[in-house]
Protein backbone atom coordinates (compact mmCIF):
# COMPACT_ATOMS: atom_id res chain seq x y z
CA UNK A 1 0.00 0.00 0.00
CA UNK A 2 1.07 3.59 -0.57
CA UNK A 3 -0.08 6.50 1.57
CA UNK A 4 0.04 9.80 -0.35
CA UNK A 5 -0.17 12.93 1.80
CA UNK A 6 -0.14 16.56 0.71
CA UNK A 7 -0.33 19.39 3.25
CA UNK A 8 -0.84 22.88 1.82
CA UNK A 9 -1.45 26.37 3.13
CA UNK A 10 -3.85 28.51 1.14
CA UNK A 11 -4.61 32.21 1.25
CA UNK A 12 -7.95 33.04 2.87
CA UNK A 13 -9.10 34.26 -0.53
CA UNK A 14 -8.31 30.96 -2.31
CA UNK A 15 -9.19 28.55 0.51
CA UNK A 16 -12.82 27.95 -0.51
CA UNK A 17 -11.93 27.37 -4.15
CA UNK A 18 -9.11 24.98 -3.21
CA UNK A 19 -11.40 23.03 -0.87
CA UNK A 20 -14.08 22.73 -3.56
CA UNK A 21 -11.57 21.47 -6.15
CA UNK A 22 -10.00 18.95 -3.77
CA UNK A 23 -13.37 17.61 -2.61
CA UNK A 24 -14.40 17.01 -6.21
CA UNK A 25 -11.11 15.30 -7.02
CA UNK A 26 -11.26 13.13 -3.87
CA UNK A 27 -14.74 11.96 -4.82
CA UNK A 28 -13.57 11.06 -8.34
CA UNK A 29 -10.50 9.26 -6.96
CA UNK A 30 -12.55 6.99 -4.71
CA UNK A 31 -13.92 5.11 -7.73
CA UNK A 32 -10.54 4.64 -9.42
CA UNK A 33 -9.02 1.15 -9.39
CA UNK A 34 -6.73 0.70 -6.40
CA UNK A 35 -7.95 3.69 -4.39
CA UNK A 36 -8.65 2.49 -0.85
CA UNK A 37 -9.46 5.95 0.51
CA UNK A 38 -9.27 9.61 -0.48
CA UNK A 39 -9.94 12.22 2.21
CA UNK A 40 -9.59 15.97 2.68
CA UNK A 41 -8.82 17.33 6.14
CA UNK A 42 -8.75 20.85 7.57
CA UNK A 43 -6.26 21.72 10.28
CA UNK A 44 -8.04 22.86 13.44
CA UNK A 45 -5.04 24.77 14.75
CA UNK A 46 -3.89 26.51 11.57
CA UNK A 47 -6.34 28.49 9.49
CA UNK A 48 -6.28 27.87 5.76
CA UNK A 49 -4.35 24.58 5.91
CA UNK A 50 -5.69 21.64 3.90
CA UNK A 51 -4.46 18.09 3.78
CA UNK A 52 -5.18 15.56 1.07
CA UNK A 53 -4.63 11.97 2.18
CA UNK A 54 -5.03 9.04 -0.18
CA UNK A 55 -4.34 5.35 0.32
CA UNK A 56 -3.57 3.26 -2.77
CA UNK A 57 -3.34 -0.52 -2.98
CA UNK A 58 -0.04 -0.37 -4.89
CA UNK A 59 2.43 1.96 -6.57
CA UNK A 60 1.14 1.23 -10.08
CA UNK A 61 -2.38 2.39 -9.21
CA UNK A 62 -0.98 5.52 -7.56
CA UNK A 63 1.17 6.32 -10.60
CA UNK A 64 -1.82 5.89 -12.92
CA UNK A 65 -3.72 8.33 -10.70
CA UNK A 66 -0.83 10.84 -10.74
CA UNK A 67 -0.97 10.82 -14.56
CA UNK A 68 -4.78 11.18 -14.70
CA UNK A 69 -6.77 14.22 -15.78
CA UNK A 70 -8.36 14.30 -12.31
CA UNK A 71 -4.94 14.77 -10.69
CA UNK A 72 -4.38 17.93 -12.74
CA UNK A 73 -6.87 19.51 -10.35
CA UNK A 74 -4.49 18.78 -7.46
CA UNK A 75 -1.63 20.36 -9.39
CA UNK A 76 -3.76 23.46 -9.87
CA UNK A 77 -4.39 23.69 -6.12
CA UNK A 78 -0.67 23.19 -5.40
CA UNK A 79 0.06 26.22 -7.57
CA UNK A 80 -2.44 28.23 -5.51
CA UNK A 81 -0.67 27.46 -2.20
CA UNK A 82 1.06 30.38 -0.47
CA UNK A 83 3.89 28.18 0.88
CA UNK A 84 5.71 25.20 -0.58
CA UNK A 85 3.36 22.22 0.00
CA UNK A 86 4.58 19.24 2.02
CA UNK A 87 4.29 16.11 -0.12
CA UNK A 88 4.95 12.54 1.08
CA UNK A 89 4.55 9.08 -0.36
CA UNK A 90 4.91 6.38 2.30
CA UNK A 91 5.00 2.68 1.48
CA UNK A 92 3.14 0.57 4.04
CA UNK A 93 4.36 -3.00 4.28
CA UNK A 94 1.74 -4.20 6.77
CA UNK A 95 -1.23 -2.91 8.67
CA UNK A 96 -2.97 -4.11 11.83
CA UNK A 97 -5.91 -3.01 13.90
CA UNK A 98 -7.34 -3.42 17.39
CA UNK A 99 -5.44 -6.68 17.86
CA UNK A 100 -2.20 -4.68 18.24
CA UNK A 101 -3.68 -2.67 21.12
CA UNK A 102 -5.09 -5.80 22.76
CA UNK A 103 -1.76 -7.62 22.47
CA UNK A 104 0.20 -4.67 23.91
CA UNK A 105 -2.18 -4.31 26.84
CA UNK A 106 -2.16 -8.06 27.49
CA UNK A 107 1.66 -8.18 27.35
CA UNK A 108 1.88 -5.17 29.68
CA UNK A 109 -0.37 -6.90 32.23
CA UNK A 110 1.96 -9.88 32.30
CA UNK A 111 4.98 -7.65 32.95
CA UNK A 112 3.24 -5.78 35.77
CA UNK A 113 2.45 -9.06 37.57
CA UNK A 114 5.99 -10.40 37.24
Task: Please place each PLM-identified region on the residue numbering.
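Short, well-ordered beta-strand segments in beta-rich or mixed alpha/beta enzyme
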Residues: 2-8, 39-66
Amino acid sequence: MVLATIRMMMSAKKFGEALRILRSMAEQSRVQPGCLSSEIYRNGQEDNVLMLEQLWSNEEDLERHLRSDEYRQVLLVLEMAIKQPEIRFDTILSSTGIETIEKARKDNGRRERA
